[in-house]
Amino acid sequence: TLAPDTVKSIVDYFDTVYDEVDLVTYRITQYFKNAPPVYHFRYRTLTHTGVYDLDDPKNRFITQTNVNICVKNDKNNGIFFDESPNFRHEDEKYCCDILRRKMKIGFCQKGEYRYNRGNENSIVSTVFSPYYIFETSMAFYEELFNSFGGRVPPYFQGIVFNDLRWKLKEDKLLPYHYSPEEFARANRRIDALLKQMDEDTIILHPSVNEYHIHYWLSRKPNCHPTVIADDGKLSIAADGRKIFSASSFPLMMRKIFVENGKARLLSFVKSPVFSHLGRGEWKVIASVDGEKRELETFTSVFSAQDSAVNVVDFPAFFCEFPADGRHEIKFFISIRGKEYPTNLLAEPTAVFSRKIRMYVRNGVMFTLNGRTLVSRSVDENEKYRAEREQSKNFKGNVKKLRNAAIEYRRAHKVELYYDLHTVDFDNGYYQFKNDIKHSDGVERYYIYSREYKNIDELFTKDEQEHLVKFGSEKHKLLYLSARVIFTAFYGVTPVSPFGSAAGEVPYSDLLDFKTIYLQHGVLHASLRSQNSVERCRADKIVISAPFEKQNYMTNYHYPEDNLIPTGMARYDHIDRSKKAKNRILFAPSWRKYLTQEINSSKWELIDSKLKSSDYFRNFSRFLESEELHELLEKTDTYLDVKLHPIIADAEGLFDIKSPRVVMAGAHVDIENYKMFITDFSSFVFDFAYLCRPVLYFVPDYGQFKAGMNHYRELDL
């Protein structure tokens, strides 16, 4: 929509510069639900009403690509919107075609184009995927650059680079669904465009962070960034100018584990120099009480740096040291034989701040002293006194809750059990039902996040005394007092009553619990970032197959002693001797690109996107097929359809005429089924456990491989 008086303001201004420009732009403001309005970076250049020369390099980032414009009504200029089907760059091309005639643009500060970013039917999340437009986009970029017959004006470099950079950030640039040969060719085409851009187009872009700048420079064929390692100083130069310098490295502490007499620190090192160095040119060195040793490293998941693909190769590592006594730990980075110190910085799971100067994990107190991490073994009394003293740094309800939790933990041994709000129960429930029987002095509570209509069927009267509502004041107290947390779903939001890691910061020193990730299926989707040892809050993980052990160790970098090979609790409740009925279970998984995230861990289906998708069309064709119905009738078989909880509302959208195709409820007895059909559901391993046949049916395989879902590969 347009703000009042926008049209009059723009037309009045256009009349004053009519002979000078063919196009006048005005402010576009992006609105998204209740978030503050967002302004495009072009308004750092367009600061006042006037005419801007697009041949001037300082105006290269105006990048007029939307239709917040007013143009001359000149039917003879032959410039129209490109109406080619699925072109998707029609606004951008139209603006480019008009502006290149005079290389000038007018800007009027009055008026506003109000752009609703909260539109659930926006095409950005779907048809802007490279699955649909990579070839179209590249052809447009290449034709635009080639049309200049030589050096491309900086303004048009900025247009194309801006498209590349935001698509990389949103993971909408690279065509992952291509074959390896096609993918390599696609990357060469991108690099050929970068070759025609000035370095300033990359370095000076107002919306590209430091690490992305070095990623793009490292890809530019005619740019050769060089790392210069001097005594006490490290720098990067490109074509004779310095583009980075530092004398130390930021080292980000992610987690500290303490177990079996050892402390284990998990960290990664940040620096753009890793974009321009080979693996053999650097080392990570630990100094424990003055004794130095080189550490083994792996590529950190934080190498993506505000993207979905790695833009740099940050080294991550574990450093072990004794848990008893007192120890001083420092780290150094060696670049071509020269050592540089590190600055220790804390991440959410290992927080030091102005108010939190120490914390204790399993009997070991950690403090920071400049560039040194100091560890010291302490008993429960010293831990208690230190935490009470630290509470004095807080006020009001935070201080009150802290002190209550410190006192409660001192007198009680608390263990908590969780599933997720999207399911009635899972492995957290089964583990709770098993453990609550023990009389060992431990207080056990199942944290529930939905109301149960059949509570007496799920829990005995005694067990109901140990149910605590998620997010309640009692949950907060127990969470801060807990010694062990068992959860079927990873992350902070499924377990924390404070909503996020940020909400836990005032209490971070009190979170001295071990997290046992029970899982809710056998991990086989490639979720390297989400489930990595660096990101997933899990001290131990229950695994169910030798494949899973190798997968977690190799691809997710978990040490072997973090894995518990007992199998998921729910497998104890599967009767492998039960005879199957004449029924087939069809359980497709959900799709991120057909939903919207309401808040963390909560997704909502968008009906309009679902109904227009290949995912829905192909599933409908299958479920509504007369041939299928006849086959089911002929074999006296029923097909039960179990939709993922996130897309369960879609069951009313199918037009199924056969009584032999049945929409199943949230819970099914898998022993009843002779066969299982799915795309990626982890239920597949439950049927493997039963030794029942499995059939894969992926209705949108191309979109899946292109990365439109939240993963694009399987680890199988």
Annotate each PLM feature.
Residues 150-151, 157, 424-432, 436-439, ...:
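Conserved catalytic-core segment of nucleotide-activated headgroup transferases in glycan assembly
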Residues 108-139, 170-183:
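Nucleotide-sugar-dependent glycosyltransferase catalytic core
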Residues 559-560, 653-657, 682-716:
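Catalytic binding pocket for nucleotide-activated donors in carbohydrate/polymer assembly enzymes
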Residues 87-94:
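Acidic donor-binding loop at a coil-to-helix junction in glycosyltransferase catalytic cores
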Residues 5-42:
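Conserved donor NDP-sugar-binding/catalytic core segment of glycosyltransferases
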Residues 265, 406, 413-574:
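Active-site and donor-binding regions of nucleotide-sugar-utilizing enzymes
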Residues 48-71, 128:
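A recurrent flexible, glycine/aromatic-enriched loop bordering the glycosyltransferase active site
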Residues 12, 35-39, 59, 150-421, ...:
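Non-catalytic N-terminal targeting/anchoring module and adjacent flexible stem/linker
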